[in-house]
């Protein structure tokens, strides 16, 4: 381990991937020498940890035998992590596995993502999941549509899965699937009208067009106006005359 500290993490990873235990003497040496991981590039640490937490045989019990290794790798106290939830999510997308492990950190998950040099996309998704997992309004249809429009369908499907596994709440996942199955409007690009339609109504200012489109979208998301061209144009005319 002294010659190549990354072998410490590889040992953890192999244990998770292959489902075998490591003898006590070796485990003790891995934990004792974990400070050497500070000499390893963050990207390589992230790669090994990700393979471990996403592994088919991930075990919270076995993972917990390497508290020093994990703490020195991630840069947070092991007690602030949630390997039990990560075990429930094993085999899921990398973002779900990371979010499950880091969920107790809340907004602090962003610092771990930065420290381990996550890609921008992975960091954005992990932070989205950790920040919204316990949001009680997430299952609301309006909120689901709004979040799909802002963060994408894939991220919302992952959020639904995480809430089901972490909280035992399936309503978010069902709502997301229902919205997607019915091809409901979730963003400006889904609306039956666009800026050109508003220009034909005599609206010329770009800022005013943007404001009215946002208002139309919000009304559609709230089911106040159907996503139909005639209804939306009538709504826009009324907004202009106000």
Model-predicted regions and their roles:
Residues 55-56, 137, 151, 205:
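Short coil/turn helix-boundary motifs
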Residues 11, 109, 144, 194-195:
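Generic structural marker for isolated residues within well-ordered, non-membrane alpha-helices
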Residues 23-24, 119, 187, 194:
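Residue-level signal for threonine
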Residues 1-116, 207-208, 212-220, 224-236, ...:
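Glycine- and charge-enriched loop/helix tracts that form the active or gating conduit
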Residues 82-170:
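Divalent metal-dependent catalytic cores for phosphoryl transfer on phosphate-bearing substrates
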Residues 13, 162-242:
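Charged substrate- and nucleic-acid-binding regions of tRNA-handling and nucleotidyl-transfer enzymes
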Residues 1, 147, 193:
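Short clusters of hydrophobic/aromatic residues that line enzyme substrate/ligand-binding pockets
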Residues 5-9, 72, 140-144, 153-158, ...:
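Charged, low-complexity, helix/coiled-coil-prone segments
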């Amino acid at each position: 381990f002294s010659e190549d500290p990354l072998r410490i993490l590889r040992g953890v990873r192999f244990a998770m991937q292959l489902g075998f235990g490591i003898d006590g003497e070796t485990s003790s040496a891995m934990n004792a020498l974990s400070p050497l991981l500070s000499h390893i590039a963050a990207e390589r640490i992230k790669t090994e940890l990700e393979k471990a937490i996403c592994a088919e045989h991930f075990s919270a019990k076995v993972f917990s035998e390497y508290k020093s290794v994990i703490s020195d790798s991630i840069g947070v106290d092991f007690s602030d992590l949630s390997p039990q939830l990560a075990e429930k999510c094993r085999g899921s997308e990398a973002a779900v596995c990371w979010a499950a492990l880091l969920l107790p950190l809340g907004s602090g998950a962003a610092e771990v993502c930065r420290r381990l040099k996550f890609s921008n996309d992975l960091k954005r998704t992990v932070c989205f999941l950790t920040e919204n997992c316990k949001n009680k309004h997430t299952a609301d249809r309006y909120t689901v549509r709004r979040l799909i429009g802002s963060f994408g369908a894939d991220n919302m499907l992952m959020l639904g899965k995480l809430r089901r596994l972490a909280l035992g709440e399936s309503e978010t996942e069902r709502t997301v699937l229902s919205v997607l199955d019915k091809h409901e409007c979730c963003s400006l690009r889904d609306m039956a009208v666009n800026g050109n339609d508003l220009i034909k109504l005599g609206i010329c200012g770009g800022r005013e067009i943007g404001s009215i489109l946002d208002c139309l979208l919000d009304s559609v998301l709230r089911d106040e106006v159907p996503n139909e061209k005639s209804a939306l144009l009538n709504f826009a005319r009324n907004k202009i005359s106000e």
